[in-house]
A protein has these predicted regions:
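Single conserved hydrophobic/aromatic residue that forms the stacking wall/gate
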Residues: 1-9
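Basic side chains
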Residues: 3, 24-25, 117, 179, ...
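Short alpha-helical interface elements
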Residues: 5, 47, 72-75, 83, ...
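Active-site nucleotide/adenylate-binding loops and adjacent lid/helix of ATP-dependent enzymes
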Residues: 14-20, 24-160
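Short acidic loop-to-beta-strand element that houses the catalytic metal-binding Asp/Glu
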Residues: 10-13, 19, 179-181
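ATP-dependent carboxylate/phosphate-activation module, predominantly the ATP-grasp catalytic core
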Residues: 125-161, 165-223
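Short, flexible coil/turn micro-motifs enriched in small/turn-prone residues
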Residues: 1, 116-119, 207
Length: 223
């Protein structure tokens, strides 16, 4: 990609082609070396200026990475009440913020019953599933929590639903979760359907593709 005259272009053999929208998964800091990390080789110089002018769309938009911080889980129900003045129809899973001493003490004392996650983690990396972890793994996590409590949250282990999945042994149940998508323009709406992620490893509850997870088509029987 390159920038010219306030627009973004894709380089092609036949000549440059104007780009209307960019789907990105890299961090904000790497988007534009003129605005953020100056040594970035992933971004496009001047991209941020084009975006601010409205000449190109970026999905996910700069700034939306705040939703990737797992500490925000603790505030979901409060945000619904604050912005919509409604009670959530589906309650957020109870979330303990280890940066709060009372929460940290509870997590350390009950780590064998909880799932501990790094607040800035992704791809299922760094997660400790307390009921399945060894004593040594739990002790190592406790040391990490004590060292940098603000880097971790914890939640009760939720029992995920299962779906029939073809394996080497035949059709077997595998754990899954459903990730819906909310689109926002002049108004906001939830898409019909979503991304169903499946833990392909037997007994696993980690659905992330980077950890061996897969995906399935999502069929909405009744709306």
């Amino acid at each position: 990609l390159s920038r010219g005259l306030g627009d973004v272009y894709k380089r092609q053999v036949t000549g440059p082609m104007k780009v209307d929208c960019i789907y990105r998964r890299i961090d904000d800091n790497f988007l534009d070396p003129k605005v953020f990390y100056k040594h970035s080789l992933l971004g496009v110089p001047g991209l941020f200026k084009c975006w601010r002018k409205g000449n190109v769309g970026i999905v996910n938009a700069p700034g939306t990475g705040i939703a990737d911080d797992k500490a925000i889980y603790s505030y979901v129900d409060k945000m619904i009440k604050f912005y919509l003045d409604e009670e959530p129809k589906l309650k957020q899973v109870q979330t303990f913020l280890c940066r709060k001493k009372i929460h940290k003490d509870h997590v350390i004392e009950n780590i064998s019953k909880l799932v501990v996650k790094p607040t800035n983690g992704s791809g299922g990396n760094g997660i400790l599933i307390g009921p399945k972890a060894s004593k040594e793994e739990r002790e190592n996590m406790i040391d990490k929590i004590k060292s940098k409590p603000s880097d971790y949250i914890a939640q009760p282990l939720e029992i995920l639903s299962t779906t029939p999945t073809i394996s080497e042994e035949g059709i077997e149940p595998r754990h899954l979760d459903l990730r819906p998508f909310v689109l926002t323009g002049k108004k906001s709406w939830v898409t019909t359907g979503g991304l169903t992620r499946v833990a392909l490893k037997k007994g696993s509850t980690i659905v992330n593709s980077s950890q061996g997870g897969g995906s399935k088509d999502t069929l909405v029987i009744e709306r």
